[in-house]
């Protein structure tokens, strides 16, 4: 697939989601969240290096993300007390397995962008930048996820420990994949599309 076609798919899917969630079809659009996540990851990965190291590292990030989320959902640590509803599909120990894919996609996108932006930077500098980008996305995502009924925190709002723990786990994930990351032409557009999609929800409420 050409870069232009992939970029068009990224833009169109995010636009359709942004508009659709503000119509009478909002609840149906939420059901497409898993499909959108898998499509975005598939496109992003198709423009990655696909080295054996990177494949193994991404698998490790999947396991890390899913394990931490399973622990979090069932113990309230380290993210706080929260539960996943049905929007992200089938679950493993009360946790959607797709949340592991989400960790992989965000790690790959932000890490690849950092590798390009800090071309001569150290592994630590890249990891810190990428983790910071992931934290910014989480800040944007949390209230939208609550509105989508994807997951809900006790009290209706994510506690400060969620963001601290998110950054620590993100930094760990970035360190795991650090050696295998290269510039990815689709990383920037996907990060920008996601940031715009979630930021829009702060200005234009979802139709629920």
Task: Show where each model-derived region lies.
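Aromatic-rich, lipid-facing transmembrane alpha helices and their immediate juxtamembrane interface loops
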Residues: 1-208
């Amino acid at each position: 697939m050409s870069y232009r076609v992939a970029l068009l798919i990224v833009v169109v899917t995010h636009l359709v989601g942004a508009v659709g969630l503000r119509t009478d079809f909002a609840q149906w659009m939420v059901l497409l969240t898993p499909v959108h996540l898998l499509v975005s990851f598939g496109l992003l990965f198709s423009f990655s290096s696909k080295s054996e190291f990177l494949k193994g590292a991404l698998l490790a990030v999947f396991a890390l993300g899913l394990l931490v989320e399973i622990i979090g959902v069932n113990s309230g640590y380290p993210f706080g007390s929260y539960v996943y509803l049905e929007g992200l599909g089938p679950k493993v120990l009360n946790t959607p397995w797709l949340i592991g894919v989400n960790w992989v996609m965000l790690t790959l996108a932000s890490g690849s962008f950092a590798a390009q932006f800090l071309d001569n930077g150290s592994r630590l500098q890249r990891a810190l930048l990428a983790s910071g980008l992931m934290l910014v996305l989480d800040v944007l995502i949390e209230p939208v996820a609550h509105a989508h009924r994807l997951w809900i925190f006790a009290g209706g709002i994510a506690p400060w420990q969620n963001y601290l723990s998110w950054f620590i786990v993100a930094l760990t994930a970035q360190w795991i994949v650090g050696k295998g990351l290269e510039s990815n032409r689709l990383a920037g557009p996907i990060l920008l599309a996601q940031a715009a999609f979630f930021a829009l929800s702060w200005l234009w409420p979802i139709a629920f």
